[in-house]
Design a protein with these regions (language model features):
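Glycine-rich phosphate-binding loop at the start of an alpha helix
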Residues: 164
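Extended, compositionally biased regions that are outside compact catalytic cores
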Residues: 1-158, 167-260
Length: 260
């Protein structure tokens, strides 16, 4: 059932998973089980990944529309762990939930770009999706601040997401190299979270992302050297947008390291 490519099966599968995820979230709130949203998050995107590898073709416009709707639904479902963080006092559980919230934003953008590109829209929408994600996180930041409770670290994390997705909107709209952009942005975001929390897992994740960003950027440069044409403009192209963003991200990273 999970790997079937029947036209209707994936609709049933992802509808069932949506209901199951909502039920697990409700149970996690009632029992204060912070692990349940993490398990549901991993399971959901593993199944989504299996379907994309086995049952998805890039020419399927109507399937892309359906999957974009489900990806959006999953995105909002996995923003709900914010409520769990507000109720669960255990620090270790909250770390896992916060990582789910952060990763959820980046996965949604990646999946959204994939599906939007196959929907045949008459305009470029990838950068608009990034801006929409930033706006959603900004609304959550405003809501948390209006609650007048001490959720400072959660607010910092959400505000970091707002700044991250606003900053990558233009490079994405110019068809920048998405993986490099995501890793560079997340590298700075996780360093900021480490500076604010001093949680070791963020430090180690930042170190890994530094290496991944460097390798990915060097691969991008190599591809540009091998495939560039004389007709491309110097500035208004994806390679320049990616290089500019990586440079700014590296500068922000160095500034954070120097100040803290």
């Amino acid at each position: 059932f999970l790997v079937s490519t029947g036209n209707g099966n994936y609709l049933v599968l992802f509808t069932y998973m949506s209901i199951l995820n909502l039920g697990m979230f409700g149970l996690s709130i009632y029992k204060k089980w912070g692990e349940l949203p993490v398990i549901a998050f991993v399971f959901t995107y593993v199944v989504m990944g299996i379907f994309l590898l086995t049952g998805f073709t890039t020419g399927s416009t109507h399937i892309s529309v359906h999957l974009f709707i489900f990806a959006t639904l999953f995105y909002f479902i996995f923003l709900l762990p914010i409520l769990s963080i507000l109720r669960i006092e255990a620090v270790k559980k909250n770390r896992g939930l916060l990582l789910v919230i952060i990763t959820n934003n980046f996965i949604y953008l990646l999946l959204g770009i994939l599906f939007l590109r196959n929907m045949g829209l008459p305009f470029k929408s990838e950068g608009l999706l990034s801006l929409l994600i930033a706006i959603i996180n900004l609304v959550l930041v405003i809501w948390l601040r209006m609650s007048k409770k001490d959720y400072k670290f959660l607010i910092y994390a959400m505000l970091g997401l707002v700044l991250t997705f606003v900053s990558i909107t233009i490079p994405i709209q110019l068809d920048g190299n998405y993986i490099t952009l995501f890793w560079a942005a997340e590298m700075v975001l996780l360093l900021w979270l480490y500076v604010k929390s001093r949680i070791g897992v963020y430090e180690r994740a930042t170190q890994v992302l530094m290496g991944l960003t460097l390798v990915s950027y060097l691969m991008d440069i190599y591809n540009v050297l091998m495939t560039s044409s004389s007709s491309e403009t110097i500035f208004l192209n994806s390679s320049f947008a990616t290089s500019l963003f990586v440079g700014l991200a590296t500068g922000a990273f160095a500034l954070l390291m120097g100040r803290y």
